[in-house]
UniProtKB/Swiss-Prot annotation:
Catalysis performed (reactions): L-glutamyl-tRNA(Gln) + L-glutamine + ATP + H2O = L-glutaminyl-tRNA(Gln) + L-glutamate + ADP + phosphate + H(+); L-aspartyl-tRNA(Asn) + L-glutamine + ATP + H2O = L-asparaginyl-tRNA(Asn) + L-glutamate + ADP + phosphate + 2 H(+)
Coiled-coil regions, chain positions: none
Gene: gatC
Source organism (scientific name): Mycobacterium leprae (strain TN)
SUPFAM superfamilies linked to this entry: Glu-tRNAGln amidotransferase C subunit
Quaternary structure, from the entry: Heterotrimer of A, B and C subunits.
Protein name: Glutamyl-tRNA(Gln) amidotransferase subunit C
rRNA-binding is among the record's keywords: no
Gene Ontology molecular function: any one: asparaginyl-tRNA synthase (glutamine-hydrolyzing) activity
Function: Allows the formation of correctly charged Asn-tRNA(Asn) or Gln-tRNA(Gln) through the transamidation of misacylated Asp-tRNA(Asn) or Glu-tRNA(Gln) in organisms which lack either or both of asparaginyl-tRNA or glutaminyl-tRNA synthetases. The reaction takes place in the presence of glutamine and ATP through an activated phospho-Asp-tRNA(Asn) or phospho-Glu-tRNA(Gln).
Sequence similarity: Belongs to the GatC family.
InterPro entries according to UniProt: Asp/Glu-ADT_sf_sub_c, GatC
An annotated GO BP: glutaminyl-tRNAGln biosynthesis via transamidation
Length: 99
């Protein structure tokens, strides 16, 4: 694989709307060369017969089951509120105008 040129890095920077210095262009060029070399090695691996997966672990639905549990009634929840109107908590306004 041929090394990534400064012009190619500059083109990618323009596509992503990044403004890079000359030092960054040189640095990214060498970094992209290393990254693409690793990708090339990975692409060379023979995966014939290997089942595609998004997770190497075989755990399936290991979360606990949902269970209904008793909860507060509306009246119980509002009983200790400093202020409630129409079955809802009253809180200070934090957004918009104070109209």
């Amino acid at each position: 694989m041929s090394p990534i040129s400064r012009d190619e890095v500059l083109h990618l920077a323009r596509l992503t709307r990044l403004v890079l210095t000359d030092t960054e262009l040189a640095s990214f060029s060498s970094q992209l060369d290393v990254i693409l070399a690793h990708v090339s090695q990975i692409q060379a691996v023979d995966v014939t017969g290997v089942e595609p997966t998004d997770n190497p672990l075989k755990y399936v639905n290991i979360t606990r089951p949902d269970e209904t549990v008793p909860c507060l009634t509306q009246q119980q929840a509002l009983a200790e509120a400093p202020e409630a109107i129409y079955g809802r908590f009253v809180v200070p306004q934090i957004l918009g105008d104070n109209k």
